[in-house]
Curated annotation (Swiss-Prot):
The gene is ENAM. It is linked to Amelogenesis imperfecta 1B: An autosomal dominant defect of enamel formation. Clinical manifestations may be variable. Some cases present with generalized enamel hypoplasia resulting in small, smooth, yellow and widely spaced teeth (smooth hypoplastic AI). Others show horizontal rows of pits, grooves or a hypoplastic area in the enamel (local hypoplastic AI). Amelogenesis imperfecta 1C: An autosomal recessive defect of dental enamel formation. Teeth show local hypoplastic and unmineralized enamel, and a yellow-brown discoloration. Enamel defects can be associated with facial and oral features including vertical dysgnathia and anterior openbite malocclusion. Glycans are attached at N114, N126, N245, N252, N265, N296, N467, N534, N934, N1040. This is Enamelin. The lineage of its organism: Eukaryota, Metazoa, Chordata, Craniata, Vertebrata. PANTHER family: ENAMELIN. The modification Phosphoserine is found at S191, S216. Residues 223-234, 429-442, 556-588, 935-951 have a biased composition (Basic and acidic residues). GO terms for biological process: ameloblast differentiation; amelogenesis; biomineral tissue development; positive regulation of enamel mineralization. Residues 103-114 have a biased composition (Basic residues). Coiled coil: none annotated. Residues 1-39 form the signal peptide.
Length: 1142
């Protein structure tokens, strides 16, 4: 037309000559202008090779836009790989490759037909025809993700001849709208084909202002009959398509209609439907193109079933986020989720942020769908109301925003989903591919959707996650983590359920639980929380204390199988972060909710926990003063706070990575480093809040990351359920432990502090890890940690679960190593055993506070009481269940029994709290090592303390060298031989000598260093071996070792039990003899012990050395220089640990 116009212009003189100037010229000019104006519609309507506008549109419609340029930046939104969009101007040619690239989205060449085919056989007959009709498009769009590739395939057939020149305007409008109306993109979701144009402007522009989906297609198809070569068949296709639209018409008609019914957006419905189809289908098959149709037809039972798809688009959407991430090629899903896309992008971003998140997100979203959907009845209802209820705004807004274009759809779909409950069932089937579960979930989701009607999208927790993610991101930075959590809704709400755990337990359970089959259990478990979730929608403060106490004592345990709840509470913690004030409450809630309540169930689940943590809070404040303290305190606090295993579990989840390389997880580093850095305030904010504040954003990744780890969490959760409750007595004890707060002054804090360190090791460990990250004045921090550990001592019993909580960190942190494997095993066993133990030793722990307050106001006494308690735990534990602890706690018993003389100092808490932790101390040998190290170091730092400890150890029930030497040695020798982990408690090789050596170790710094080394495995090695073996190892790791020995004497003492077992367990896995030279003597059992500490250090080094860092602080108060050495070496050790862990 432009050419015509130009011709007209150029030939105007001739025309004027030929025709009367006035009229003809005007006519021609008018015609030229008209043609020019029409030119674009003509271009748009049909490219030469395309039989129909639908076909044209199909070219670009992976993401409903051939014009990737505009959408190129949105490529991630619409599909993670939107390469197609970038070369979209080349789209005519591009669609074919992109379809392949976007295979899930568009299966390249056959896609067009396949889309039609996939959409339906009816569509398939119509495929050629359907190429033209927008209806078919809409139809396809319901199936768009699956059909889309087909669309792409055939349109490429049609359009490749056309070349790229036209498509930017023509094709993009056509194909883009046709491809998928990105509901999220400002264009009205009117036209599947046009409305779906990512260029809203384009489509409004191309489509002559967003004409109705069929109008655009029909108009163009009819307008441009020239391309309608195939249009006549396509004309049939409209008829057929309506038939397909009858069958799948519901997809077309219903899509628009259900869209209208759902959201009133045809495009949105199409987007919904198409993405939904893809979404639902995508869960079955991320590529899902083939599977998608299968799921579509299969899940929905056929073209007609796709109607359920459409209704189930919410569910599909639920899947959609998941498929989106999975099927990034399903850019359309992303696309149609234009809003969702943003959210989803955030979600994927979060997921991507947490690299595991994508997969895990898939895992979560999918698994949550899988598991959560199964658990949906419980989870989704509770979870959406909870998590989405927790984020009702987010839920509603995500529903509105993310599903805003779909909002009408999605919300109605949410509502419709309730109506669609049956359909969501099928859809869930498709979407979840867990039709049965999903179907129940469909109702649940219905319920959930009603409950969280605004969160109807929330009901689609995955979509909601997407929504949440994006939504919450918009909602608030603080909530951004929540968006992550929301986006990870199941993830992060999995975290969030930490805070909201019982409230978001659905999300959590769904997401986290989905990560693990436990999620289903969590579902049921969470169902209680759903009530809590709904009431928890009160939100964290009200809900969490109530929910958490309820949940934690019973649900916490129960919930811990919902380890995701465990880390979900972490996730909730980040959400708490979103609500800093609330968060603090919440975090305590989440923390105490899962563990805080467990810790201080009797205390205000979160208040006493907060109080207790704020006893710690004082410590914590000081810890806040020192980021490390903060970190450590935070660690305990958070573990205590996250005592809800949820908070901790996330660190479990995260620490594993952090353990892996001091990776500075958002969790660990963000706790420790971020905590350290912003931890002071943030930690002060609350450890949970720090999580919440610091982590939530970063936690978001953690949330997502944690979702990955929730499995660990699960282990821990499983273990945790008891641990929190059973540590809970310890925490009650911790409540009585305020004397330990006094103890802070005296180095009961060293003992308790070591206890704390032992308690902390997980926390201290990761805190050390954080410290190792070199953040804080290690020593001040350690002082804080020391007295903080004293504070933690007062919390120490409170902490044991915290240590468990920390231990998740520990487990995760040291190992990541045995993320949960060992500690979860150990935790399971150890929690069982340790709970038993906790019941007796930790009851001792409970008595321990009594010991401390009554008879041992002194740090030494307290420390010894800790030893006693821990010893009771270790030895008594050994006696109680040497086999149990050795075997059940094998890896942890060492930790637990690691310091009969000294480790038991820390072991009391460790035995129970830390021992549970030691259960995780397999990975958190450093937990014990640090604690033990702290204890030993502290003791070696202060001989009186050590002497007292030795005496107390001797006096301590199990600490009593008879018990220790015999009981512990007997059980532990076996365990030590078995696992060499028992050495600590049993001082396995130490035997009776161990007691003397313990004495010596505690009495003599020399022995403390040397005998500590020897104490673990071969105190028999005694000072000489310590001198020689450690020295030789020192030579290897002289810098680290000599300082580390100083650092490690206690550590070795602590490590022995753990170190031996862990050394064996981990040393064989990852021996780093040089790092832990002293642990070689320490692990007399196996020379690997040298590396065992490093293996432990690997696991525990980060934690251990961080605990050593704590020890430096602990010892700083005692022997600043020695601990300075240690502190310095701690760094080195931390480096070793980091090296090992890295």
């Amino acid at each position: 037309m432009l050419v015509l116009r130009c011709r007209l212009g150029t030939s105007f003189p001739k025309l004027d000559n030929l025709v009367p100037k006035g009229k003809m010229k005007i006519l021609l000019v008018f015609l030229g202008l008209l043609g020019n104006s029409v030119a674009m519609p003509m271009h748009m309507p049909r490219m030469p090779g395309f039989s129909s506008k639908s076909e044209e549109m199909m070219r670009y419609n992976q993401f409903n836009f051939m014009n990737g340029p505009h959408m190129a930046h949105l490529g991630p939104f619409f599909g993670n790989g939107l390469p197609q969009q970038f070369p979209q101007y080349q789209m005519p040619m591009w669609p074919q490759p992109p379809p392949n690239t976007w295979h899930p989205r568009k299966s390249s060449a056959p896609k067009r037909h396949n889309k039609t085919d996939q959409t339906q056989e009816t569509q398939k007959p119509n495929q050629t025809q359907s190429k033209k009709p927008p209806q078919k498009r809409p139809l396809k769009q319901p199936s768009h993700n699956q059909p889309q590739p087909e669309e792409e395939a055939q349109p490429p057939q049609a359009f490749p001849p056309f070349g790229n020149g036209l498509f930017p305007y023509q094709q993009p409008p056509w194909q883009i709208p046709q491809r998928l109306p990105p509901p999220g993109y400002g264009r009205p979701p009117i036209s599947n084909e046009e409305g779906g144009n990512p260029y809203f402007g384009y489509f409004g522009y191309h489509g002559f202002g967003g004409r109705p989906p069929y109008y655009s297609e029909e108009m163009f198809e009819q307008d441009f009959e020239k391309p309608k070569e195939e249009d006549p068949p396509k004309a049939e296709s409209p008829g057929t398509e309506p038939t397909a639209n009858s069958t799948v018409t519901e997809t077309n008609s219903t899509q628009p209609n259900p869209k209208g019914s759902q959201g009133g957006n045809d495009t949105s419905p199409t987007g919904n439907s198409t993405p939904g189809l893809n979404t639902g289908n995508n869960p079955p098959a991320q590529n899902g193109i083939g599977p998608l149709p299968a799921v579509n037809a299969s899940g929905q039972g056929g073209p007609g079933s796709q109607i359920p798809w459409r209704p189930s688009q919410p569910n599909i959407r639920e899947n959609h986020p998941y498929p989106n991430i999975r099927n990034f090629p399903s850019g359309r899903q992303w696309y149609f989720t234009g809003t969702v896309m943003g959210h989803r992008q955030n979600r994927p971003f979060y997921r991507n942020q947490q690299v595991q998140r994508g997969p895990r997100w898939n895992f979560f979203a999918w698994e949550r769908k899988q598991v959560a959907r199964p658990g949906n009845p419980v989870y989704h209802k509770a979870y959406p109301p909870t998590s989405r209820g927790n984020y009702p705004n987010y839920a509603g807004n995500p529903a509105n925003l993310r599903r805003k274009p779909q909002g009408p759809n999605k919300h109605p779909v949410g509502t419709t989903v309730a109506p669609l409950g049956p359909k969501p069932g099928p859809v869930v089937r498709n979407e979840k591919i867990q039709n049965p579960k999903e179907k129940p979930l469909g109702p649940k989701e219905q319920i959930i959707v009603p409950t969280k009607n605004p969160t109807s999208p929330w009901r689609n927790s995955q979509q909601y996650e997407v929504n949440k993610s994006n939504y919450k991101l918009p909602h608030s930075e603080g909530y951004m983590p929540v968006p992550n959590f929301n986006s990870v809704d199941q993830h992060e709400n999995s975290y969030y359920p930490r805070g909201d755990s019982r409230k978001v337990p659905n999300s959590d359970g769904q997401t986290q639980s989905q990560n693990l089959p436990k999620g289903i259990v969590l579902g049921s478990r969470r169902m209680p929380y759903e009530s809590e979730t709904n009431q928890s929608e009160l939100k964290h403060s009200s809900y969490q204390p109530a929910v958490y106490p309820e949940e934690i004592p019973s649900p916490a345990k129960e919930h811990f199988p919902a380890g995701r709840n465990t880390w979900d509470h972490q996730e909730i913690s980040p959400p708490f972060k979103e609500d800093p004030g609330r968060q603090e409450e919440h975090l305590p809630h989440p923390s105490h909710g899962s563990r805080g309540s467990v810790f201080y169930p009797e205390y205000n689940p979160y208040d006493p926990r907060e109080n207790s943590p704020y006893l710690r809070g004082n410590t914590w404040d000081e810890r806040d003063d020192s980021p490390n303290t903060m970190g450590q305190k935070e660690s305990p606090l958070y573990p205590i706070n996250t005592p809800d295993q949820k908070e901790i579990v996330p660190y479990n989840e995260e620490d594993p990575v952090d353990p892996t390389g001091d990776e500075v997880f958002p969790g660990q580093n963000r706790w420790g480093e971020e905590l350290s850095f912003k931890g002071g305030p943030t930690v002060r904010h609350y450890e949970g809040e720090q999580y919440t504040s610091n982590q939530p954003k970063e936690y978001l990744p953690y949330s997502l990351d944690n979702p990955s780890k929730p499995r660990e969490d699960f282990y821990y959760s499983e273990f945790y359920p008891w641990s929190p409750d059973e540590n809970f007595p310890s925490y009650n004890t911790a409540s009585t432990m305020p004397p330990p707060i006094e103890s802070r002054g005296y180095y009961v804090n060293n003992a308790a502090g070591p206890e704390e360190s032992t308690l902390f090791p997980s926390r201290n460990s990761w805190d050390h890890r954080i410290q190792a990250q070199g953040q804080r004045e290690r020593r001040p921090y350690f002082n804080r940690n020391i007295w903080d550990q004293a504070t933690h001592l007062q919390k120490a019993p409170a902490r044991p679960p915290d240590q468990k909580g920390n231990q998740p960190y520990y487990s995760n942190t040291p190992a990541g190593l045995q993320k949960n494997p060992i500690w979860h095993e150990g935790e399971n066993l150890n929690y069982g055993m340790q709970i038993t133990r906790m019941n007796s030793p930790e009851r001792e722990h409970s008595s321990f506070p009594n010991f401390i307050p009554p008879s041992y106001p002194s740090g030494q006494k307290e420390a010894h009481l800790f030893h006693l308690s821990q010893r009771g735990s270790c030895c008594a534990g050994s006696s109680t269940g040497p086999k149990d602890n050795p075997l059940a706690l094998q890896d942890y018993t060492p930790s637990y029994g690691l310091a009969p003389g000294e480790n038991q100092d820390t072991s009391p808490l460790y035995t129970d709290g830390s021992h549970t932790k030691q259960t995780r101390d397999i990975i958190s040998p450093t937990s014990i090592l640090p604690g033990q190290r702290n204890s030993s170091e502290k003791r070696e730092s202060q001989n009186p303390f050590r002497d007292d400890v030795s005496t107390l150890r001797r006096n301590t029930p199990c600490s009593i060298k008879n018990q220790l030497g015999q009981k512990e040695i007997m059980p532990f020798p076996e365990a030590s031989s078995l696992q060499s982990k028992n050495t600590p408690c049993l001082k396995n090789d130490l035997g009776g000598d161990g007691n003397n050596i313990l004495e010596q170790v505690f009495e003599d710094n020399q022995l403390n260093e040397r005998t500590v080394d020897l104490t673990p495995e071969q105190l028999v090695i005694g000072t000489p071996d310590e001198g020689s073996n450690p020295e030789g190892i020192q030579s290897q790791v002289q810098e680290n070792e000599s300082e580390r020995q100083q650092q490690r004497p206690s550590n070795i003492l602590h490590l022995p039990c753990f170190g031996s077992k862990l050394a064996k367990h981990h040393s064989s896995t990852t021996g780093t003899p040089s790092s832990d030279g002293r642990q070689s003597p320490f692990d007399g059992d196996s020379i690997t012990p040298t590396e065992n500490p490093n293996t432990l250090v690997e696991l525990a080094t980060e934690e251990q050395f961080k605990s050593i860092n704590v020890d430096p602080l602990d010892a700083d108060e005692h022997s600043p220089f020695e601990f300075l050495q240690r502190g310095t070496n701690v760094q080195d050790q931390v480096q070793d640990c980091l090296l090992l862990q890295a």
